[in-house]
């Protein structure tokens, strides 16, 4: 039986270090948020959504968006919103500021998914550096656990996953780069 997957790009955040909405920063002439969205969608060949506040820019008008009851409550709230509403077996997450994580890396995450738990991107040179927002989650085996942790007051993803099966998938520092300032994209 083929497992179903969907993709979600986190569009929230204040971009305070960036000085402007980083989703709109051009990478090779294309808004960074769309670079990430297109990389993820190309990799999984399935429904892909932005998660977070309304994106008020014409380039994003055709891209579907998910808004949940925890909107504005940080990344863990967004993860719980997706897990709560997902209709697929697996969900793949990406933050909007990781344009160097290419379709082949997203495919690797999705293909590494297991019957339980989470496949999380980790830095090959610093394995303790996990990138929870670049990850693939088994919806059925993680949904209740994560929502319970959130409802108990937890807001840190690395603490909320305690007790879940975690598989590290290693990538290079460049592939995992978060663009937090305009100079990071040069």
Language model features: what each stretch is:
Residues 2-154, 159-175, 182-183:
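Nucleotide and nucleotide-moiety/phosphate-recognizing core
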């Amino acid at each position: 039986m083929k497992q179903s997957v969907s993709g979600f790009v986190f569009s929230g955040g204040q971009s305070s270090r960036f000085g402007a909405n980083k989703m709109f920063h051009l990478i090779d002439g294309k808004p960074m948020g769309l670079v990430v969205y297109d990389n993820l969608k190309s990799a999984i060949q399935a429904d892909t959504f932005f998660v977070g506040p309304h994106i008020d820019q014409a380039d994003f008008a055709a891209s579907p968006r998910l808004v949940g009851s925890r909107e504005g409550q940080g990344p863990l709230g967004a993860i719980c919103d997706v897990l709560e509403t997902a209709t697929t077996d697996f969900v793949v997450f990406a933050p909007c500021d990781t344009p160097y994580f290419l379709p082949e890396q997203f495919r690797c995450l999705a293909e590494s998914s297991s019957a339980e738990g989470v496949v999380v991107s980790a830095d090959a040179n610093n394995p303790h550096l996990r990138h929870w927002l670049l990850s693939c989650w088994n919806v059925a085996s993680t949904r209740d656990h994560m929502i319970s942790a959130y409802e108990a007051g937890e807001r840190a993803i690395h603490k909320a996953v305690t007790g879940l099966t975690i598989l590290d998938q290693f990538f290079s520092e460049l592939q995992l780069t978060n663009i937090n300032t305009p100079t990071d994209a040069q």
